[in-house]
């Protein structure tokens, strides 16, 4: 399972994101420290993510500016997940919807081959507009990165952290949680 998960989120080969939860705040949110770590995303890190030991993020854009996965990040705290799920289906968009850490949604696009990030971002922008979220974040955030000078793309938190008790899961047609 971990190997397939890593394959789905294949991106930058030289870095990943990592989040450590520090403590809970009064408003119910958690205080966390998020950093970019300049080591590859590995099966061991995926295991730690799925077990809840570490929160891991993946960088969709590779050093050659190609992507095999991408995402829309909709951070709307009053988001009606069922309505959004139905809209994705009605528009026949090839997106896998997951509840995000904030209670919004990450809508993932998985491709069978690597495609230039600029092309993917154009398609994501079209999909976001069709869904009524034209100003949401797109991952990759960059059309290109200058790998030769050490630039990296931005990372997105992966779903299913602490998979047995997660609040970050994929949603079926009825917006009910799907297990791994």
Model regions: which residues?
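DNA replication initiation modules
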Residues: 56-79, 85, 90, 111-180
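An amphipathic, hydrophobic-aromatic interaction surface with interspersed Lys/Arg
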Residues: 94
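Short loop/turn and capping residues at structural boundaries
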Residues: 17-20, 99, 139
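Short, conserved phosphate-binding/catalytic loop or strand-edge motifs used
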Residues: 97-106
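DNA replication initiation on ssDNA origins
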Residues: 1-69, 77-86, 153-155, 160-163
């Amino acid at each position: 399972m971990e190997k397939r998960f890593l394959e789905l989120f294949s991106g930058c080969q030289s870095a990943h994101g990592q989040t450590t939860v520090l403590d809970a705040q009064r408003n119910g949110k958690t205080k966390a420290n998020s950093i970019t770590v300049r080591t590859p995303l590995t099966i061991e890190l995926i295991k730690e993510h799925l077990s809840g030991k570490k929160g891991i993020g993946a960088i969709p854009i590779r050093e050659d500016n190609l992507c095999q996965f991408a995402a829309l990040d909709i951070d709307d705290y009053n988001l009606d997940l069922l309505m959004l799920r139905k809209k994705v289906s009605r528009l026949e968009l090839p997106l896998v919807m997951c509840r995000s850490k904030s209670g919004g949604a990450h809508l993932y696009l998985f491709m069978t081959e690597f495609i230039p990030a600029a092309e993917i971002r154009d398609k994501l922008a079209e999909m976001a507009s069709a869904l009524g979220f034209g100003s949401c974040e797109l991952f990759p955030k960059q059309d290109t990165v200058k790998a030769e000078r050490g630039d990296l793309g931005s990372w997105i938190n992966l779903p299913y952290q602490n998979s047995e008790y997660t609040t970050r899961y994929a949603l079926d047609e009825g917006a009910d949680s799907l297990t791994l």
